[in-house]
Regions:
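Histidine-centered phosphotransfer motif of kinases
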Residues: 72, 76-84
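Membrane-anchoring alpha-helices and their flanking helix-loop junctions
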Residues: 1-71, 88-146
Length: 146
């Protein structure tokens, strides 16, 4: 199967899992902890997008001419802060009203995101020489762990 076809499939699976999680139960909670987790996840996403914008580069798989690796801001903490923030939000939403089906959807979403990460990192390792060193010193999604 072609790489682009795989990417479309993983994106579709991730979107379907996300939609299922969002429509299968409440997404808003009066619990302060879940609100804080969701806000933190959203702020992490915004911070990462600002870091990309400030560097005036984007993160498409086909790297633009003159691309350089972004290692400042949230990218000093994890290699994929947008995915990390999104997963924080989705985990907290599943926890609001935990069901087996929502857990399965969350695991499917995590698998789809993992496949996207592996694809992105393969491209980055091939095309950006300093990425291997960056990868060795910075965790993918969870600081100090993963």
């Amino acid at each position: 199967m072609e790489r682009n076809t795989k990417a479309v499939i993983f994106n579709a699976i991730g979107i379907l899992a996300t939609v299922f999680i969002l429509v299968s139960g409440p997404i808003v909670t009066p619990t302060v902890l879940y609100i804080l987790i969701q806000v933190f996840g959203l702020l992490l996403i915004i911070w990462a997008l600002i870091a990309i914008k400030v560097s005036k580069k984007h993160t498409r798989h086909a790297l633009p001419e003159g691309y350089f690796l972004i290692t400042k801001g949230p990218y000093e903490i994890v290699r994929h802060p947008v995915y990390a923030g999104f997963l924080l939000i989705m985990v907290s939403i599943v926890e609001i009203e935990f069901t087996f089906l929502r857990l399965v959807a969350l695991l499917i979403l995590c698998g789809a995101i993992l496949m996207k990460i592996l694809r992105e990192e393969h491209t980055m390792t091939e095309e950006v020489h300093e990425y291997k060193e960056y990868k060795e010193k910075t965790k993918a999604i969870i600081p100090y762990l993963l």
